[in-house]
Regions:
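A short, hydrophobic C-terminal helix/tail in secreted or cell-surface proteins
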Residues: 194-195
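Catalytic core of bacterial c-di-GMP phosphodiesterases, primarily the EAL and HD-GYP domains
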Residues: 23-28, 55-132
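Catalytic-site/binding-pocket detector for metal-dependent nucleotidyl cyclases
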Residues: 8, 54-55
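Conserved long alpha-helical elements within nucleotide-processing catalytic cores of c-di-GMP signaling
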Residues: 47-48, 57, 137
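Active-site core of bacterial EAL-family cyclic-dinucleotide phosphodiesterase domains
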Residues: 1, 5-49, 87, 148
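Cyclic nucleotide signaling catalytic output domains
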Residues: 45, 49, 66, 87-88, ...
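Conserved adenylation A10 loop of the ANL superfamily
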Residues: 190
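The catalytic core of metal-dependent phosphodiesterases that act on cyclic dinucleotides
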Residues: 105-179
């Protein structure tokens, strides 16, 4: 039996607040599974099973479409539209039809790609740095916003950063913790900000 036979998928929006102005600047879409008793399961509880059956891209697309549907409703109600971030798994990143699939969903709900932020982790096993750069360039060409997650955990470096126009750079927590306590980390971070 599939997960959908026992569990209900739910997409939540986690607000993103500007630390300087304390104003809402966007949101990140998160998916959870809930059973009939109301128990909520986090990705770590169900992603391994989905990976085993090669179903992760279906979840990526499901979340993306749910967000597009939400944005369409907001527009119909005259609400101000802020970017919503959707995670892309490495399984989706290697799909040759990714761009066209996402654009098709955007057109279905009359949503502009500029309202969608695609969150890509640089900590992936099936995507080389060259492939990642090519993917980001193509997504940016289609006007999608790009967020690089977990910066500093894999091959993300100044060369990668200079090759791409990221809209958002999420620094890995392990680096943030070291700031101020490790002079080498602080120097590297200062150099990054200068660029």
């Amino acid at each position: 039996r599939g997960l959908g036979d026992v569990y209900k998928r739910q997409v939540y929006l986690q607000p993103q607040i500007c630390s300087k102005t304390n104003q809402l600047k966007g949101a990140e879409a998160l998916i959870r599974y809930c059973n009939k008793n109301g128990q909520v399961f986090l990705p770590k509880d169900f992603i391994p099973l989905l990976e085993e059956h090669k179903l992760v891209p279906l979840i990526d697309y499901y979340v993306f479409e749910q967000v597009c549907s939400m944005i369409h409703k907001w527009k119909m109600n005259g609400m101000n539209i802020l970017p919503v971030s959707v995670n892309l798994s490495q399984e989706s990143m290697v799909k040759t039809s990714l761009n066209s699939d996402l654009l098709k969903i955007c057109r279905k709900y009359d949503v502009s790609p500029v309202d969608m932020e695609l969150e890509i982790s640089e900590h992936v096993n099936e995507v080389t740095e060259k492939e990642l750069i090519t993917l980001i360039h193509s997504l940016k060409k289609d006007k999608f916003r790009i967020a690089l997650d977990d910066f500093g955990t894999a091959f993300a470096n100044f060369a990668l950063l200079s090759s791409n126009d990221f809209d958002v750079l999420k620094i890995d927590r392990s680096i943030v913790v070291k700031l101020g306590s490790d002079s080498r980390t602080t120097v590297s971070y200062t150099h990054l900000r200068a660029h």
